[in-house]
């Protein structure tokens, strides 16, 4: 178990993301992190890596560039960034890895594709506390002037609360902030992962030379707002906190298959 980390002012915090080094969400996260600690490092992808999942670069060299004190961009995936930071760039490991703030929610099955979640997961695999933060964006827009305002306002409180409790060393914490006005936020709720699948709306198009290509859209086959899930809670304006385990073994199925081999 991770012991409670109650004094974040003494903590070393590593930030990463999947939207890229120049992303607005990372800038918001840096401001949040600096309200918690003075020892903040940023190691993020040089370019956007949304949907990269837990990909690791093993067939190409990893280029990195210093972008200021304790600030680096890496020409690689979010997973690469956390590995490079912890195993090469930093003189000692961070006390906390925070990934985000993603431009868009990471709810339900999103977590399997998300580079934001993968960066946090890599931190967990390295034996570190890790939190993934995502700000939900409605595709039809809500007219909110500052789309990151809920995350910017509540992220530090959520991080403090989570770090103030012990949790399993095989678990990362996935946090999603609702897309709503500040006064419409209903609270912070612990929820299990919901279900929603993307990638079923593959569209074939033609380029100017009349060659076919495919485009994977963001249309969800079904958003199941089942009670008790992150998706249902976010639809009510709640901030959701979902523990995710890196050990994906299903013990009941092991029991069910006992004797088959």
Swiss-Prot record:
Cofactors: a divalent metal cation
One annotated GO molecular function is: 5'-nucleotidase activity
Residues annotated to bind a divalent metal cation: 18-19, 50, 102
Kindly give the SUPFAM superfamilies that the UniProt entry links to this protein.
SurE-like (SSF64167)
Listed under catalytic activity are: a ribonucleoside 5'-phosphate + H2O = a ribonucleoside + phosphate
User: Localized where?
Assistant: Cytoplasm
Q: Please give the positions of the paired cysteines in each disulfide bond.
A: none
Main subcellular location of this protein, as a coarse class: cytoplasm
Q: How is the cofactor bound?
A: Binds 1 divalent metal cation per subunit.
Return any one Pfam family short name: SurE
Q: Name one GO cellular component term.
A: cytoplasm
Might you give the EC number(s) for this enzyme?
3.1.3.5
UniProt KW keywords: Cytoplasm, Hydrolase, Metal-binding, Nucleotide-binding
Return the broad EC class: hydrolase
Its function? Nucleotidase that shows phosphatase activity on nucleoside 5'-monophosphates.
**PANTHER family membership:** 5'-NUCLEOTIDASE SURE (PTHR30457), 5'_3'-NUCLEOTIDASE SURE (PTHR30457:SF12)
Family note = Belongs to the SurE nucleotidase family.
Task: Provide the protein name.
Answer: 5'-nucleotidase SurE
Q: What is the lineage of its organism?
A: Bacteria, Pseudomonadati, Pseudomonadota, Alphaproteobacteria, Rhodospirillales
| This protein's encoding gene | surE
């Amino acid at each position: 178990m991770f012991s409670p980390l109650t004094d974040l002012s003494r903590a070393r915090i590593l930030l990463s993301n999947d939207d890229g080094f120049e992303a607005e969400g990372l800038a918001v996260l840096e401001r949040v992190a600096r309200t918690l600690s003075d020892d903040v490092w940023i190691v993020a992808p040089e370019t956007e890596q949304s949907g990269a999942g837990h990909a690791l670069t093993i067939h190409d060299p990893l280029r990195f560039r210093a972008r200021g004190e304790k600030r680096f961009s890496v020409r690689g995936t979010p997973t690469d960034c956390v590995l490079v930071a912890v195993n090469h760039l930093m003189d000692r490991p961070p006390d906390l890895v925070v990934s985000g703030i993603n431009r868009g929610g990471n709810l339900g099955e999103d977590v399997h594709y998300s580079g934001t979640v993968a960066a946090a997961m890599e931190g967990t695999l390295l034996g570190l506390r890790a939190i993934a933060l995502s700000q939900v964006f409605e595709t039809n827009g809500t007219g909110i002037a500052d789309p990151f305002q809920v995350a910017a306002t509540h992220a530090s409180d959520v991080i403090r609360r989570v770090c103030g409790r012990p949790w399993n060393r095989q678990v990362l914490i996935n946090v999603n902030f609702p897309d709503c006005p500040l006064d419409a936020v209903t609270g912070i709720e612990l929820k299990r992962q919901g279900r929603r699948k993307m990638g079923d709306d593959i569209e074939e198009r033609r380029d100017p030379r009349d060659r076919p290509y495919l485009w994977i859209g963001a249309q969800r086959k079904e958003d199941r707002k089942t009670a008790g899930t992150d998706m249902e809670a976010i639809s009510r304006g709640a901030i959701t906190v979902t523990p995710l385990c890196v050990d994906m073994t299903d013990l009941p199925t092991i029991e069910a298959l006992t004797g088959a081999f």
